[in-house]
From Swiss-Prot:
Belongs to the peptidase C40 family. GO terms for cellular component: cytoplasm. It is an enzyme of class 3 (hydrolase). Involved in cell sporulation. Hydrolyzes gamma-D-Glu-L-(meso)A2pm linkages only in those peptide units that have a free N-terminal L-alanine. The lineage of its organism: Bacteria, Bacillati, Bacillota, Bacilli, Bacillales. It comes from the Bacteria. It comes from Lysinibacillus sphaericus. It holds the Pfam family SH3_3. InterPro entries: NLP_P60_dom, Papain-like_cys_pep_sf, Peptidase_C40, SH3-like_bac-type. It is found in: Cytoplasm. This is Dipeptidyl-peptidase 6. Keywords: Cytoplasm, Hydrolase, Protease, Sporulation, Thiol protease. The active site is at 178 (nucleophile), 224 (proton acceptor), 236. Residues 1-64, 72-140 form the SH3b domain.
Length: 271
């Protein structure tokens, strides 16, 4: 059975308990596979990026046919940190839902010119709403960029989360953790990497030597991951810093963090 997330975000827990560890947030419009239905309206699900956990039934829409159609039609994502979907194309209109960066929508006006101020979108429930056109971007389903462009795009995507508060298990501008930041930077550029802070076989990130490291590659530490920006700098969702920020591997740099620079366990790269 397949389903679509219809909440702003579906919290994914390590156990079927609201007090259990939050391990991920599945964003609006993302499809999930229902592996098991449990009592008390809990579901055990697998995301499209192959991460598993427990979510609540009322956060998703159950319907194989609707989900399959949605996967084919919904090819746009929210590019803004937050965006309100409104009932009418005017700022005074009633809000239907607020969505975060990376949420998936069906662009009903996909053939209109890019200078149209408002775009009609369809929600997973079938409801039509409107949002500012510049806040909606085509979804990159698969990475097709040449290496230099891809690396630059991943870096810019990661930097768009600067100052986002740290949230364990978070994956949005409301709050994000280290692996959530890196996985979203790659996902929004068409590459699925493992959600947690380690290199896992079966995913495209492979270990390389540090002398080959370039911008867009990943630095792994014990229980932590960061994205390399080049020039000794890296961006990460730092529990110690309370938010997404930039630090340096260079001990002479004012942004140097010795605790991280001296504990690198691996460098990971798509290339």
């Amino acid at each position: 059975m397949n389903a679509i997330v219809i909440a702003m975000m579906a919290n994914l827990y390590a156990e079927p308990d609201l007090h259990a560890e939050l391990v991920d947030e599945i964003l609006y419009g993302m499809p999930v596979q229902i592996i098991e239905e449990l009592e008390n309206d809990w579901l055990y699900v697998r995301t499209a990026y192959r991460y598993e956990g427990y979510c609540q039934r009322n956060d998703v829409l159950f319907d194989d046919a609707i989900t399959n159609t949605w996967i084919q039609k919904a090819q746009h994502v929210i590019g803004q940190r937050f965006a309100d979907v409104l009932q009418e194309p005017k700022i005074q209109s009633t809000k239907i839902i607020t969505l975060v960066k990376g949420s998936i929508l069906y662009n009903v006006d996909s053939d209109t010119t890019s200078n149209t101020p408002w775009t009609a979108v369809q929600l997973a429930t079938g409801e039509i709403g409107y949002l500012r056109s510049q806040w909606l971007h085509p979804k990159i389903a698969e990475h097709t960029f040449e290496e230099h462009a891809f690396r630059e795009n991943v870096v810019q995507t990661a930097l768009s989360y600067i100052a986002t508060p740290y949230r364990w298990g978070g994956k949005s501008p409301l709050g994000i953790d280290c692996s959530g930041l890196c996985s979203m930077a790659y996902l929004l550029n068409g590459v699925i990497i493992f959600r947690d802070a380690r290199i896992v076989e079966g995913f495209p990130i492979k270990e390389i030597t540090i002398d080959r490291m370039q911008k867009g590659d990943l630095l792994f530490f014990p229980g932590h991951v960061a994205l390399y920006l080049g020039q000794t700098l890296y961006v990460h969702a730092s529990l110690g810093g309370n938010e997404v920020n930039v630090n340096s591997l260079d001990e002479q740099h004012p942004l140097y963090r010795q605790d991280l620079a001296t504990t690198i366990t691996a460098i990971g790269s798509l290339f």
